[in-house]
């Protein structure tokens, strides 16, 4: 088996990948994550996932490189990482009582052959009706400033949900393991 490399500095993605009990290393790719003019969100996350994997291919020949990227979408609006307390509160108040789609792009690049599998795994969350006080308490408690949509589904963020819908709950955290296992299997990796 070629060595696995996770093209991410995200602790959340490392924790998810560790669930597969496969040895792996990780490195942070340096790419421009700006959305292209008119680029649909699905194509954005697919492109960025692939670019993250490709960015590390030169320094990691003969690896299986996993790239992933996620955006939250409310209607037609792409919600990025809020980075500030105020913006996180604004995002959550905008999403209150609404359905938010999380699109997670996934790429598995075999840097020895150049073959790359790419997909987008959607997951939908309907948020409860939230008051400003609830939102501010949540953001203060969990500090979801580096999370698309301003919440951490793997933590207290689940308390904001009214319902969820999707094929792979791990995609909500940023690395869709069910789809990744399919991709790894096509590369001859046995899981479990």
Swiss-Prot record:
Location of this chain's protein in the cell: Cytoplasm
Active site: 69 (proton acceptor)
Positions bearing the site annotation: Important for substrate specificity: 12, 70, 154
A biological process term (GO) from this entry: nucleotide metabolic process
GO molecular function, one term: nucleoside triphosphate diphosphatase activity
Cofactor: a divalent metal cation
Listed name of the protein: 7-methyl-GTP pyrophosphatase
Organism: Pseudomonas putida (strain ATCC 47054 / DSM 6125 / CFBP 8728 / NCIMB 11950 / KT2440)
Upper taxonomic lineage: Bacteria, Pseudomonadati, Pseudomonadota, Gammaproteobacteria, Pseudomonadales
